[in-house]
């Protein structure tokens, strides 16, 4: 026998079961997607961090290489500068080279010293040219005098002496004689009278005449005159 009213009451009072939230089944697809996204972000962050580290290391290596290259270039530059300063210092006189001059003082001294030496070189060059011209003139004059002396000497004159001033203190003396004679005593007397004998030479002409050429220099204590010198030498030759 059915009781409809009882069934309606049962249905109206049937409890609804509510499970706790931690007992609900998880949505696998949603949870899986969230985990993948989290892992992707974590991997991306790690990759970026590693890339940043590599970039920092590369930048550090580049900076270190630049610093080493700069130091090497600086050492090479200083070595070249020191070599140049040594070359400059070598141009200075020995007295300046021994002094411990600073680099600015060395440069200043060289800048002043080079024009001085240039002027000195020019002066010496002019002096050399003057001396060469004077020597050339003297040589030519001596040749002319020797020729004139040889032409003027005849058989009746056994000795002939000619003297000529070369400078204020130097005298050239030519002696022509018909026989070989010792001039050592004559040279000794010249030394005693304040004359230094610079050189003595001899030659023989085609006429068998003997020629002596003396280059004399007067000292400060020389008291003999040229005429007295010639007469004294002639007297000595005649007595020899």
Swiss-Prot record:
State the SUPFAM superfamilies in the record: HLH, helix-loop-helix DNA-binding domain
Q: Which Pfam families match?
A: HLH
Q: What induces it?
A: Up regulated by iron deficiency in roots and leaves, as well as by nickel, high zinc or high copper treatments. Repressed by high iron, low copper and low zinc treatments.
The cellular location(s) given in this protein's UniProt record come to:
Nucleus
A biological process (GO) of this protein is:
regulation of DNA-templated transcription
What are the recorded GO MF terms, alphabetically?
DNA-binding transcription factor activity; DNA-binding transcription factor activity, RNA polymerase II-specific; protein dimerization activity; RNA polymerase II transcription regulatory region sequence-specific DNA binding
Q: Which UniProt keywords apply?
A: DNA-binding, Nucleus, Transcription, Transcription regulation
Q: Which domain of life is it from?
A: Eukaryota
Q: Indicate the principal place this protein occupies in or around the cell.
A: nucleus
Q: In which tissues is it expressed?
A: Flowers.
Q: Name one GO cellular component term.
A: RNA polymerase II transcription regulator complex
Q: Which SMART domains match?
A: HLH
Start and end residues of each bHLH domain: 65-117
Quote the subunit structure annotation: Homodimer.
Q: What is this protein called?
A: Transcription factor bHLH101
Organism of this sequence: Arabidopsis thaliana (Mouse-ear cress)
Encoding gene per record: BHLH101
